[in-house]
């Protein structure tokens, strides 16, 4: 986009990556300045612990500070919606509008129930056992193309998800998930301590929740 144009920050869901937004970006005005972020453990960012929800929110807060956002449009999907909310609760000057797509913000009573998940180890979580290796991008495309939810996705979005969601194996042939199963499982098990309600009280920015 064009520096000085309307700023937009796009934050992806758990297990996704910044390039999942490519088809959305293509439909936005070409003179807007658009930023899409790979959260830690996703895309081209490093798999550096901790994978806590507060840490993801703080990471995005630092990104906003580095980019010097002001009156941007903040768009977040799932975990990304949580993080956009976290950032806005700390500094509302970054955004003038929020678009939160299925944001991970639970009913207050559910946070106590979520704490019970802490007894499950990452290794025992079903997501941690997900296949991590693929011989090619096409193999991943073929494996998931007829499965939910991927089979109802726009084809171009699904192709972006696969193409940019894999990294070359460091010590061999083939590809591995940029967001390995153990990282995704760690995030799901960490949502019990992600109570945003103190920050939400600070937010007066107009928001659309989908």
Language-model segments: what does each one mean?
Residues 156, 166-210:
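Conserved serine/cysteine hydrolase catalytic core
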Residues 22, 61, 85-89:
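Short, hydrophobic alpha-helix immediately C-terminal to the catalytic nucleophile
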Residues 70-115:
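Conserved hydrolase catalytic core segment
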Residues 9, 35-37, 77, 101, ...:
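The conserved SAM/SAH-binding core of class I Rossmann-like methyltransferase domains
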Residues 7, 31-33, 70-73, 94-97, ...:
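Structural signature of beta-strand start/N-cap positions in the alpha/beta core
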Residues 1-49:
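Conserved HGGG/HGGXW glycine-rich cap/lid loop of the alpha/beta-hydrolase fold
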């Amino acid at each position: 986009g064009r520096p000085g144009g309307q700023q937009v920050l796009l934050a992806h869901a758990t297990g996704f990556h910044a390039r999942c937004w490519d088809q959305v970006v293509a439909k936005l005005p070409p003179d807007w300045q658009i930023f899409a972020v790979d959260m830690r453990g996703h895309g081209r960012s490093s798999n550096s612990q901790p994978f806590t929800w507060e840490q993801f929110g703080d990471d995005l807060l630092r990104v906003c500070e580095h980019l010097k956002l002001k009156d941007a449009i903040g768009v977040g999907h799932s975990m990304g919606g949580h993080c956009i909310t976290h950032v806005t609760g700390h500094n509302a000057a970054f955004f003038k509008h929020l678009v939160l797509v299925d944001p991970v913000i639970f009913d207050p009573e559910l946070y106590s129930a979520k704490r019970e998940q802490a007894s499950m180890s990452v290794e025992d979580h079903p997501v941690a056992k997900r296949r991590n290796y693929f011989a090619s991008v096409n193999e991943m495309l073929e494996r998931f193309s007829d499965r939910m939810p991927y089979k109802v996705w726009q084809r171009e979005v699904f192709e972006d998800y696969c193409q940019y969601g894999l990294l070359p194996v460091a010590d061999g042939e083939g590809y591995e998930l940029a967001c390995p199963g153990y990282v995704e499982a760690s995030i799901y098990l960490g949502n019990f301590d992600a109570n945003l309600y103190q920050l939400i009280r600070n937010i007066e920015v107009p928001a659309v929740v989908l």
